[in-house]
């Protein structure tokens, strides 16, 4: 009887060990602190819009992030509504160009996962966006371009002009109607080819190609892997604040730093051509 009980105990223990799936090693690359009241689960795809600290209640610059194929995140230099795009490598970028004061750049992504933001004129409806210590009213005069992504994963927002006769119902940013925790996302933007689309799962950001959002060794925000790029500083610990902005740990301030015709996004300032921004989460809709 004693041996039978010992055998059963051993069997149950082995079953428990088999069922246990330890977290990926990179998932432990998180900041030591967390955002108070932050949401770490958001399974519906959403995008990002760059909001510089120069916003006023009458003028809003929302650069929607784009992503190129390598996963990098970039933002272009133009003052107009634009969703962030992503190029193939996962990088996120924002392009540079001067335009009217009311802006919204949607982050796009290129094939490598980099994130970029380019400049395009877009029309948005008047909506209210809550940002820490201030409420911003958007009254943009152009159509919102959704975040795009190229093969390397970089995130970009492409440069394109939109006619002033654009139909609002087809291209706009507007308050979203979401149940429960999805209420944290305040606005919507039109989704287009290359638009950066991400989900938040247990504090981990995942793009539409399954790559992991991380802060890499040079402090840049981009998508790679899995696993994330070697030497990555953070690969977990992401959340959406109660104001609807993206945060890593207890920090929701990022920096867009000029790199040629694009801005790359970082979690820290890396030089003189860097400006602090918030990354506003936006719901993505087909227009």
UniProtKB/Swiss-Prot annotation:
Q: What induces it?
A: Cell cycle-regulated. Expression peaks during mitosis.
Annotated keywords? Cell wall, Cleavage on pair of basic residues, Repeat, Secreted, Signal
Any single GO BP term: fungal-type cell wall organization
Pfam families recorded for this chain? PIR, PIR1-like_C
State the encoding gene: PIR5
The yes or no answer to whether the keyword Repeat is present is yes
User: Which residues are part of the propeptide segment?
Assistant: 22-62
Locate the site labelled Cleavage: 62-63
The record lists the organism as: Saccharomyces cerevisiae (strain ATCC 204508 / S288c)
Q: Where in the cell is it found?
A: Secreted, Cell wall
Q: Which residues form the signal peptide?
A: 1-21
Where mainly located? Answer: secreted
* Protein name stated in the entry: Cell wall protein PIR5
Mind telling me how this protein is modified after translation? Covalently linked to beta-1,3-glucan of the inner cell wall layer via an alkali-sensitive ester linkage between the gamma-carboxyl group of glutamic acids, arising from specific glutamines within the PIR1/2/3 repeats, and hydroxyl groups of glucoses of beta-1,3-glucan chains.
């Amino acid at each position: 009887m004693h041996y039978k009980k010992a055998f059963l105990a051993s069997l149950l223990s082995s079953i428990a060990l088999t069922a246990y799936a330890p977290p990926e090693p990179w998932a432990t690359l998180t900041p030591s602190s967390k955002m108070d009241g932050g949401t770490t689960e958001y399974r519906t795809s959403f995008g990002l819009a760059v909001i510089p600290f120069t916003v006023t209640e009458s003028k809003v610059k929302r650069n929607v992030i784009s992503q190129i194929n390598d996963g990098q995140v970039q933002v272009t230099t133009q003052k107009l509504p634009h969703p962030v795009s992503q190029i193939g490598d996962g990088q996120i970028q924002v392009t540079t160009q001067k335009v009217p004061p009311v802006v919204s750049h949607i982050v796009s992504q290129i094939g490598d996962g980099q994130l970029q933001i380019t400049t395009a004129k877009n029309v948005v409806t008047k909506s209210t966006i809550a940002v820490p210590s201030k409420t911003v009213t958007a009254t943009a005069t152009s159509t919102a371009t959704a975040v795009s992504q190229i093969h390397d994963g970089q995130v970009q927002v492409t440069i394109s002009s939109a006619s002033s006769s654009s139909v609002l119902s087809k291209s706009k940013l507007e308050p979203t109607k979401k149940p429960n925790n999805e209420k944290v996302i305040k606005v919507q933007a039109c989704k287009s080819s290359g638009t950066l689309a991400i989900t938040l799962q247990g504090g981990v950001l995942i793009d539409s190609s399954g790559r992991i959002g991380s802060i890499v060794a040079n402090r840049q925000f981009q998508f790679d892997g899995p696993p994330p790029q070697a030497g990555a500083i953070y690969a977990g610990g992401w959340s959406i604040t109660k104001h609807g902005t993206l945060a890593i740990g207890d920090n929701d301030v990022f920096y867009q730093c000029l790199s040629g015709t694009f801005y790359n996004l970082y979690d820290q300032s890396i030089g003189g051509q860097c400006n602090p921004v918030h990354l506003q989460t936006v719901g993505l809709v087909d227009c």
